[in-house]
């Protein structure tokens, strides 16, 4: 196995493959950091700084970017959240073959960071009132993961209304 994040396609289903080198210290440190933050053992500032350090250490670690995006959303800093989410999405999109129209489903744990980053980008765009961008990303996440583990479909109707697409929104909301 290579030391780089990969994306494989089988039967029109895509799956990210974490490198073996990530298992152990890097993932352990990341999980311990999340646990410490969730337990209020470290400050938000410390959490952000440590996530940024991990991102510098391994830029392809999509989940670090996704978690940064979510903490910025919690701080009501949607522009920072969008930038963090887009960094994670750029990593994943770079690996997804051009023209890929298959699924990237939640059931595969290695796909979850990409889907989390995608959902964070949706939320950030909605907060920034970039409704067309939010709609495009909602449609993309629903194409990739029709099970919609994040509940993105519930944002589609309101975002369509905000763009003036009333008929389309009515159809979605019924």
State each model region's role:
Residues 154-163, 167-174:
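Long, repeat-rich segments with strong aromatic
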Residues 1-104, 112, 118-121, 125-147:
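N-terminal alpha-helical interaction modules that lie
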Residues 65, 118, 152-153, 160:
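Canonical tetratricopeptide repeat
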Residues 132-135, 148-151, 166-170:
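Short, structured loop/turn "capping" segments at alpha-beta junctions
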């Amino acid at each position: 196995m290579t030391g780089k994040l990969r994306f494989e396609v089988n039967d029109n289903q895509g799956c990210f493959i974490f490198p073996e080198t990530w298992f152990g210290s890097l993932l352990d440190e990341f999980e311990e950091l999340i646990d410490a933050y969730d337990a209020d053992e470290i400050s938000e500032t410390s959490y952000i700084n440590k996530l940024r350090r991990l991102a510098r250490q391994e830029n392809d670690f999509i989940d670090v970017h996704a978690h940064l995006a979510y903490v910025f959303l919690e701080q009501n800093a949607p522009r920072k959240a969008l930038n963090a989410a887009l960094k994670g999405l750029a990593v994943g999109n770079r690996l997804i073959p051009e023209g890929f129209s298959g699924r990237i489903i939640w059931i595969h744990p290695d796909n979850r960071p990409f889907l989390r980053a995608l959902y964070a980008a949706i939320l950030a765009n909605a907060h920034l009132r970039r409704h067309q961008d939010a709609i495009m990303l909602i449609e993309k996440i629903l194409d990739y993961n029709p099970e919609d583990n994040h509940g993105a479909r519930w944002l589609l109707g309101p975002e369509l209304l905000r763009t003036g697409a009333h008929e389309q929104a009515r159809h979605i909301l019924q």
